[in-house]
Every structure is written in C-alpha cells, then in structure tokens.
Swiss-Prot record:
Subunit organization: Part of the 30S ribosomal subunit. Interacts with proteins S7 and S18. Binds to IF-3.
This protein's name: Small ribosomal subunit protein uS11
Family: Belongs to the universal ribosomal protein uS11 family.
InterPro entries per the UniProt record, alphabetical: Ribosomal_uS11, Ribosomal_uS11_bac-type, Ribosomal_uS11_CS, Ribosomal_uS11_sf
Pfam families (alphabetical): Ribosomal_S11
Any one annotated GO CC term: ribosome
Segment forming the signal sequence: none
GO BP annotations, alphabetical order: translation
Gene3D superfamilies: Ribosomal protein S11 (3.30.420.80)
GO molecular-function terms, A-Z: rRNA binding; structural constituent of ribosome
Length: 129
C-alpha cells in the first residue's frame, strides 16, 4: 500500500488587533510569546531559536533579535496594540521590550508577573565562583 501523504497544517491569518506579549527572561535564555486575549499563541520566538547558543542566549542583544522576529510574525496576523507581561530575572527584559516598541506596536500596559515566594520552598544553594 502507498503511504498517505502527511498534511501540513497551515496557520491561517488571524485578524487580531490587541494581544498579550509574555516575555520570560531567565538567566540562560529569553522566550517571547504573543497570545490573544484567550491565551492562544499567535507567534513565539526565543534567543535559542534565533541561532544563539550557550552563554550568548542570555545577552540583551539576543533578546532584542528574538523580540524583533516575534514582532514580525505577529504583524502578519494584524496585531497592532500589545499588553506586556514580563517574567523572570534575566538581562533581556528591557531590550526585548524596547525592540517591540521600535517595531511600531502600541504598548498599552506593562506588568511584572515574576513569581515572588512568601517564604515558600528553600532556595537552591548559593554559587561560589
């Protein structure tokens, strides 16, 4: 029997005017996800997906490149205004935000949603360099 050809699911163009940007900036990488108001992903990118490897992923420039790529993908879906949610302690937070602003989006709000423990779990041991 002949193999059935795989169907490639093509992402149809959604017409979304406002959306939410989640910038997750860790010490090792920066992930940017653009979702609609329900939380369905429109576009995503990360420093690692842009070809940065190792310690270069954690740089502000890598976050800027990832944010610019994500903005280009979101523009194809008609996104104009953004709400920004920033999470994590990494170095790519501000540069990713600046890259989204320079891409021509209207930023309506910026929220820091970094989880802060109220004396919860014991933290990992301190690094001694």
């Amino acid at each position: 029997m002949a193999k059935e050809a795989k169907r490639v699911r093509r992402s149809e163009r959604k017409n979304i005017s406002s959306s939410v940007v989640h910038i997750n900036s860790t010490f090792n990488n920066t992930m940017i996800t653009i979702t609609d108001s329900q939380g369905d992903t429109i576009a995503w990118s990360s420093a690692g997906a842009q070809g940065f490897k190792g310690s270069r992923k954690s740089t502000p420039f890598a976050a800027q490149v990832a944010a610019a790529d994500c903005a280009k993908k979101a523009e194809e879906h008609g996104v104009r205004s953004l709400e920004v949610e920033v999470c994590g302690p990494g170095s790519g937070r501000e540069s990713a935000l600046r890259a989204l602003q320079s891409a021509g989006f209207i930023i309506t709000s910026i929220r820091d949603v970094t989880p802060i423990p109220h004396n919860g779990c014991r933290p990992r041991k301190r690094r001694r360099v």
